[in-house]
């Protein structure tokens, strides 16, 4: 289990929030009000203590084995929570709420996981209630908010990341899957039941595949492997021979920086359908900014530039120029930060309404 990362000294001056909202989550004098944000993915589990301005004060991270199922993940999570709560107490941080960003569809109102596409045993599990029970002895009855991880990431990037200051923010993350979310005036858009903004499941053409088939990380990995096999003397093949891991999209940044044409073709082939899907979002919503995150976005400016350039070509003339396309800025912290801010926001609103 990873130890705490204390970062900069914690002071109240780091919390830039309207006074009435700060009062709604404030505790004993001298304690800094914070939330725990949790990310539960297929292989990664991380928790962070987050201030109301999105500043990460403490973090812990563990790898989990999907073969262990949901029960195995919960065993690791219980230990991780105990550790980070202890870290927070030692740094005079008052935990006021907990937010969870879960990698799959959830029923937010009930705090229940609908299902997981990567780890068995999560279907219909009351995760929010389970977490509340795990921390009750150490924290008392703190509110626990459950979000889909894409929604949590969207809120984080909209409030304190690449979309900060914009009124309408669309965020999309491309990794093992493709998710997205929408924030309007600082509030997540929520559709019916347990899902909305499922960009990765758009069918670009009737009877065709979904966007993830073309633009998810695994689809790009497959194209890289094909290129390595087809061009044994090419730059990607040379990079693959020098690498310890199997060929994947991780080979692209160096090849792109060197001007390799094959790498650019692979990138454009993934960015094109992605831009096409985003053009539908722009035609429907015309947001102020589009923020790109996820593992694929770590390719950086070449990915952002290809998506932005191709997006422009898909838009009707009155909607050009397209909304700015930005890279996400919160990195690995995006889901915990967004989940924590969602939890703090819920608690402050409840306090102003006089709810417990």
Question: In which residue ranges do the predicted regions lie?
Answer:
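Glycine-rich phosphate-binding loop of actin/hexokinase-like ATP-binding domains
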Residues: 164-218
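A structural motif shared across PLP-dependent enzymes of the aminotransferase-like
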Residues: 104, 122-128
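Short hydrophobic alpha-helix segments
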Residues: 60-62, 117, 192
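Glycine-rich oxoanion-binding loops at beta->alpha junctions
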Residues: 146-153
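Short, glycine/acidic-enriched loop or turn micro-motifs at the edges of active sites
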Residues: 42, 152, 176
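A charged helix-plus-loop insertion that forms the helical arch/lid used to bind
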Residues: 112-123
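Short beta-strand segments
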Residues: 39, 99-103, 147, 171-177, ...
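ATP-binding/phosphotransfer module of carbohydrate and carboxylate kinases, centering on a glycine-rich
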Residues: 2-97, 107-112, 131-142, 156-166, ...
């Amino acid at each position: 289990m990873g130890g705490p990362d204390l970062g900069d000294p914690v002071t109240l001056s780091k919390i830039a929030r309207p006074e009435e909202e700060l009062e709604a989550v404030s505790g004993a004098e001298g304690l800094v009000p914070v939330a725990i944000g949790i990310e539960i993915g297929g292989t990664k589990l991380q928790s962070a203590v987050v201030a109301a301005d999105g500043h990460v004060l403490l973090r812990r991270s563990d790898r989990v084995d999907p073969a262990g199922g949901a029960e195995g993940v919960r065993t690791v999570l219980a230990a991780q929570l105990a550790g980070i709560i202890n870290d927070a107490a030692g740094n005079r941080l008052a935990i006021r709420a907990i937010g969870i960003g879960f990698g799959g569809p959830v029923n937010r109102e009930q705090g229940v996981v609908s299902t997981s596409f990567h780890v068995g045993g999560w279907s219909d599990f009351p995760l929010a209630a389970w977490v509340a029970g795990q921390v009750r002895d150490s924290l008392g009855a703190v509110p626990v908010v459950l979000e889909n991880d894409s929604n949590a990431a969207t809120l984080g990037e909209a409030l304190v990341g690449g979309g900060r200051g914009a009124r309408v923010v669309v965020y999309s993350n491309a990794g093992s899957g493709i998710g997205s979310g929408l924030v309007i005036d600082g509030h997540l858009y929520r559709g019916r039941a347990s899902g909305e903004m499922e960009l990765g499941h758009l069918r670009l053409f009737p009877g065709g595949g979904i966007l993830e088939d073309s633009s998810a990380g695994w689809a790009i990995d497959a194209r890289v492997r094909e290129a390595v096999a087809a061009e044994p003397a090419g730059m990607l093949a040379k990079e693959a021979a020098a690498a310890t891991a199997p060929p994947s999209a991780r080979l692209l940044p160096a090849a792109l920086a060197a001007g390799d044409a094959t790498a650019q073709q692979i990138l454009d082939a993934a960015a094109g359908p992605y831009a096409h899907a985003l053009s539908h979002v722009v035609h429907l919503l015309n947001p102020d900014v589009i923020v790109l995150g996820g593992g694929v976005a770590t390719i950086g400016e070449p990915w952002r530039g290809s998506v932005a350039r191709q997006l422009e070509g898909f838009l009707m003339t009155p909607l050009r120029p397209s909304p700015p396309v930005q890279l996400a800025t919160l990195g690995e912290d995006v889901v915990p930060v967004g989940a924590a801010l969602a939890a703090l926001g819920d608690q402050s609103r409840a306090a102003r309404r006089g709810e417990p």
